[in-house]
């Protein structure tokens, strides 16, 4: 399946926090045999959220949105999602009743309980704001522990595909292996090959759905590296 990840938050765009949520989900999805088509970061703006979610829902099989589900003034993601699908924002009775036992702040409880009409609730075991699913979009809290808790439940819904990965470490600079690497890329179109330079060495990752094709590409690359001609 193809996924698009949308991270919502002014604090990400300003550089105040690092977007670890997107990296976490992308890695999990990839290793489950899925493809992440793109990762988008957008501000806490209802209109932008609505526009980007509407577009993403048409481009991908499923969309994962994080951030903006709390009780403060800038938590507007639920409203943006509702607008994206022309749905009313309604109070989830089950969420409202549960939160009312935890807090006497009526305004906060009502805001966190508000979801697009027809949403399915995904309970958050480590925080107040639950996730919800509407059409082909899942919306999760932005706090990493809460995102991980709800994301794992959502990920279980999708059948795992084949995924195989091997990594080769090459000492020296990337420029030394470019020609050989390009040859392997040309010869192995079904294998995704990434080159990641580090101080003093390069990590080359080979991945794909077919284990034998991945191994074949790795073998070819290692043979080319050993060929000193």
From Swiss-Prot:
Annotated Gene3D superfamilies: MoaB/Mog-like domain
Positions in coiled-coil regions: none
SUPFAM superfamilies from the UniProt entry: Molybdenum cofactor biosynthesis proteins
Pfam families registered for this protein in UniProt: FLAD1_M, MoCF_biosynth
Listed InterPro entries: CinA, CinA_Arc, FLAD1_M, MoaB/Mog-like_dom_sf, MoaB/Mog_dom
Sequence similarity: Belongs to the CinA family.
Protein name: Protein AF_2251
């Amino acid at each position: 399946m193809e996924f698009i990840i949308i991270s919502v938050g002014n604090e990400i765009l300003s550089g105040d926090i690092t977007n670890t949520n997107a990296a976490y989900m992308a890695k999990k999805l990839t290793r489950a045999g899925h493809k992440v088509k793109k990762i988008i970061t957008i501000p806490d703006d209802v209109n932008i959220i609505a526009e980007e979610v509407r577009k993403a829902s048409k481009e991908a099989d499923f969309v994962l949105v994080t951030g903006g589900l709390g009780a403060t003034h800038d938590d507007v993601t639920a409203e943006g999602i509702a607008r994206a699908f022309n749905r009313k924002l309604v109070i989830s009775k089950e969420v409202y009743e549960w939160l009312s036992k935890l807090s006497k702040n009526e305004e906060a409880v009502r805001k966190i309980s508000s979801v697009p009409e027809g949403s399915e609730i995904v309970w958050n075991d480590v925080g107040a704001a639950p996730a919800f699913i509407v059409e082909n979009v899942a919306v999760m809290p932005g706090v990493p522990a809460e995102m991980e808790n709800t994301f794992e439940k959502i990920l279980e819904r999708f059948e795992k595909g084949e995924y195989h990965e091997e990594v080769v470490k090459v000492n020296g600079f990337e420029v030394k292996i470019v020609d050989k690497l390009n040859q392997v890329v040309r010869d192995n179109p079904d294998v995704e090959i990434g080159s990641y330079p580090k101080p003093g060495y390069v990590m080359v990752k080979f991945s794909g759905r077919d284990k034998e094709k991945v191994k074949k590409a790795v073998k070819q690359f290692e043979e080319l590296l050993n060929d000193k001609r």
